[in-house]
Amino acid sequence: MTFAEEKTYKYIRYNHSKFCCVDVLEILPYLSCLTTSDQDRLRASYKQLGNQGTLWELFNTLQRRPGWVEVFIRALRICELPGLAEQVTRVYQSYLPPGASLHSLDPLQSPRIPTTVSEPSAFAAGHTIPDSGFQDKPGYPKPVQDTQPPKSPVENSEEPPQANFGAIPRMSGDSLISSPNPPALSPQPSREHPEQEPELGGPSTANVDSVPIATYGPVSPTVSFQPLPRIAPRTNLSPGVTVSALSAKTTLSSSSTGSAFAKGAGDQAKAATCVSTKEGVPTNSVTTSSVPSIKPVPVNTMSSKLPISTKSTAATPSTVPTNIAPSKLPINSVYTGIVPSKVTASVAKASASTMPPERNNKQAKETLEAPATVVTTGSSLTRPDISSRSLHSGPELSKPGVLVSQVDNEPFSACSMDLAISPSTSLGSEPNHGPEENEYSSFRIQVDKSPSVDLLGSPEPLATQQSPEEEEPCASSVSWAKWLGATSALLAAFLAVMLYRSRHLAQ
């Protein structure tokens, strides 16, 4: 705020009673130096405090804006308050530096009305906004829409390339305003876009300068939005494990009665193998997750009697198998890609034959109740279950149904050196008065009188609390006896004196 503006504000503050005739709601639209938030706040204050309470806040808000005096004088003249306008003009000119003069203070014909709803508008190329914030013409021309269909690339090639001599920034409400310093853009026809193909695996960039922008209004969506053609399909670079991801159809055949088909297309493939057994054992299903990968992995399954293996038709077979324990043993999930299983069909068959029939029946019942085993192959695998190795230990398999536990019958022996206790030298010959961490002080209590029978039945604190209560009646009885004796003595003396006087008067 300049010196002249400060003096003018002090004049308005000292002569505030002269400006009480100003209507806040009437003058607000003509104060272009105020922001939209200032006007909204003043209107809200007008509803709560009225015109007089809001007028003081109006002047406080005005004096924070540069050039507010000239705007205020112009607003006073528009609101038909020429007397106040002349007073403010005279005070303001008196404090201006020599040689400085006021700007044109003629009232505008059309005031600036704050717009609450933004409407789409398009200005002419040579149209500019005045510095004072007013608009000479309040009317807004309608945007020109291009309803013609887009021309073919052949027709575009026949036309000469159009060059944009001014950058037209996009404003809110789809309005176009020319920038004061337009940069020169390199003209290129739009037919060069189909020739530019995006690189595989890289970001596709479009040349912004090659798109001609119409100067007469916004372009229709059919012309402005034209997707570029894509030649090669998008490739997926995420690692993982999949079963025949590039093949269109893959057939998995098994040597037993069960068969399954798997079809893979694009980035995902799923394979499922269903195996049925002759003994009525539930079907073991193997599901391969649809995680994309480069190396195919075959899946091997074994039934209760005969091993059944399904081989993939991929070009490069893998040496890492996925095995499942036979149905005679407890079902455990075996994970692929960490440690290959060494249990073959012959070993599984031999272990199943050596087991007693009772255990076989129990295991058959357990496998009937157990859910289907699902083996999932993916990029991130966990460690195999260690509890499955403990099934092949010697003493546990030799004694089925019996838990063998080894108990050490030897007693525990230890010495005092094993105990972490700090040594204490309190019993030594030399006196040591320093504090010790684990040293405890002890004292001896000697009782000369043995406890009575009454004290054993009742706690000691109750006895100590009852003793004063018993002593109080004794003290009160002694005091009453003293008072009674003194009173009787006085009464006897009084009677003796009365008898003596009566005898003396009788004589």
From Swiss-Prot:
Chain spans, region Interaction with DHX33: 340-507
Q: How is it modified after translation?
A: Following activation, phosphorylated by TBK1 at Ser-422 in the pLxIS motif. The phosphorylated pLxIS motif constitutes an IRF3-binding motif, leading to recruitment of the transcription factor IRF3 to induce type-I interferons and other cytokines. Ubiquitinated. Undergoes 'Lys-48'-linked polyubiquitination catalyzed by ITCH; ITCH-dependent polyubiquitination is mediated by the interaction with PCBP2 and leads to MAVS/IPS1 proteasomal degradation. Ubiquitinated by RNF125, leading to its degradation by the proteasome. Undergoes 'Lys-48'-linked ubiquitination catalyzed by SMURF1. Undergoes 'Lys-48'-linked ubiquitination catalyzed by MARCHF5 at Lys-7, leading to proteasomal degradation.
Please list the residue ranges that the record marks as compositionally biased, kind Low complexity.
250-266, 281-293
- Which region ranges are annotated with the description Interaction with TRAF2? 143-147
According to the UniProt entry, the cross-link of type Glycyl lysine isopeptide (Lys-Gly) (interchain with G-Cter in ubiquitin) is at K7, K10, K305
Write out the transmembrane intervals.
Answer: 483-500
Name where it mostly resides: mitochondrion
Segments for region (Interaction with TRAF6): 153-158, 435-440
Residues on Cytoplasmic side: 1-482
Region feature Disordered, mapped onto this chain: 123-238, 250-326, 350-401, 423-474
Give start and end of each CARD domain: 10-77
Q: What does this protein do?
A: Adapter required for innate immune defense against viruses. Acts downstream of DHX33, RIGI and IFIH1/MDA5, which detect intracellular dsRNA produced during viral replication, to coordinate pathways leading to the activation of NF-kappa-B, IRF3 and IRF7, and to the subsequent induction of antiviral cytokines such as IFN-beta and RANTES (CCL5). Peroxisomal and mitochondrial MAVS act sequentially to create an antiviral cellular state.
The name of this protein is: Mitochondrial antiviral-signaling protein
Origin species, per record, is Rattus norvegicus
Query: What is the name of the gene encoding this protein?
Result: Mavs
